[in-house]
Amino acid sequence: MGEDRVSFEVMRSNQLPFVEWGNYRYSLKRNGGRNVTFVAWGYLRVPLAGNVPNALFCLSKVKQMRRLTRIDLPRSPASVSPYDLYCEPRDEKVVMSVLDSDMVALLRNNKFSFEFAEGYFYVHFAGLFRFWKPETVTLLAEIVSRVEAIRLSES
């Protein structure tokens, strides 16, 4: 989906946990390439300890978040306000138990969508991360610390 895919302003840790954050962009061309729309977002990737089922918590009111990926997972009828939850029905209980209410509130207050995929916790922001702002880096570091605390408590 899309063309001209590029990650930029990517930062990766060189020690455990192997965390990555950055910005991602691609373009959608319509009408034979005359109309180009750029879709961009910030992301954070943190490894998880256990085998957590794949799930996507997508902010209901942020249109750009719905375009991030083609959602192959079924939508859960019991969404977590203000998130639409996409996961297999049998996995909903496990997925919900991974995050505490403080973490969900932190993500909601900062308008992040998030997902569990292939052993990683991903956070998506509908827009670009502004890494030159100390509060952006502090916020991402807080999320990493919380996920790492959950990971360590499970192992």
Language-model features: where?
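Charged, low-complexity intrinsically disordered regions
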Residues: M1-S155
